[in-house]
């Protein structure tokens, strides 16, 4: 159900309710940090996702897992929200709810998500340069980066913000040269 229209339809009201609660309690960034960590954990640990979405695993066991995952650093409101998801049998949509919440948070804080692909791992200084460039291009107040390494681009970077793609990769430049040579003949 990951990424399906059905999943996002169910996740949306929960994410909106959660951001409403976060705004009331002035905890939008705290929830955002907790949900980013939880989302990373869900994506990196297929076992955790399997346990939470399994109909065979008892609800109390799921709650126990969530309590241990959030630990002492987790917010009480957020923990109660997760317990509600277990009770309502909506915990299977947790990943989609986290993604929707983070998208709403980006709208709320005028932050854009930039997906950056590079041939080599970017240094912190390079990430800061990319963030500044994306701010200039988009007019956003802040930039959230998702980075990945792809040796196939040969060099440079590709930045995707929403539906816009800024391709300054060597592969992209070679492709554009090839296209211009093809039309020049």
From Swiss-Prot:
Location relative to the cell: Cellular thylakoid membrane
BP-aspect Gene Ontology terms: proton motive force-driven ATP synthesis
Pfam families documented for this protein: OSCP
Keyword NAD attributed: no
GO cellular component terms attached to this protein's record: plasma membrane; plasma membrane-derived thylakoid membrane; proton-transporting ATP synthase complex
Membrane topology designation: Peripheral membrane protein
GO MF entry, a single one: proton-transporting ATP synthase activity, rotational mechanism
Subunit organization: F-type ATPases have 2 components, F(1) - the catalytic core - and F(0) - the membrane proton channel. F(1) has five subunits: alpha(3), beta(3), gamma(1), delta(1), epsilon(1). CF(0) has four main subunits: a(1), b(1), b'(1) and c(10-14). The alpha and beta chains form an alternating ring which encloses part of the gamma chain. F(1) is attached to F(0) by a central stalk formed by the gamma and epsilon chains, while a peripheral stalk is formed by the delta, b and b' chains.
Function according to Swiss-Prot or TrEMBL: F(1)F(0) ATP synthase produces ATP from ADP in the presence of a proton or sodium gradient. F-type ATPases consist of two structural domains, F(1) containing the extramembraneous catalytic core and F(0) containing the membrane proton channel, linked together by a central stalk and a peripheral stalk. During catalysis, ATP synthesis in the catalytic domain of F(1) is coupled via a rotary mechanism of the central stalk subunits to proton translocation.
HAMAP family with a match to the protein in the record: ATP_synth_delta_bact (MF_01416)
Name of this chain's protein: ATP synthase subunit delta
Species assigned in the record: Synechocystis sp. (strain ATCC 27184 / PCC 6803 / Kazusa)
């Amino acid at each position: 159900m990951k990424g399906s229209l059905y999943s996002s339809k169910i996740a949306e009201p929960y994410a909106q309710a959660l951001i409403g609660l976060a705004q009331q309690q002035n905890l939008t960034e705290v929830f955002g940090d907790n949900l980013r960590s939880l989302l990373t954990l869900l994506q990196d640990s297929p076992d955790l996702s399997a346990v939470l979405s399994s109909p065979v695993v008892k609800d109390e066991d799921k709650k126990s897992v969530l309590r241990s995952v959030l630990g002492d650093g987790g917010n009480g409101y957020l923990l109660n929200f997760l317990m509600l998801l277990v009770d309502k049998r909506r915990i299977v949509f947790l990943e989609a709810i986290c993604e929707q919440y983070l998208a709403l948070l980006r709208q709320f804080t005028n932050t854009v998500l930039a997906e950056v692909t590079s041939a080599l791992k970017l240094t912190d200084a390079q990430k800061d340069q990319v963030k500044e460039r994306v701010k200039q291009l988009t007019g956003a107040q802040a930039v959230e980066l998702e980075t990945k390494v792809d040796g196939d681009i040969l060099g440079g970077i590709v930045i995707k913000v929403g539906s816009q793609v800024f391709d300054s990769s060597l592969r992209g430049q070679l492709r554009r040269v090839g296209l211009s040579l093809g039309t020049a003949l």
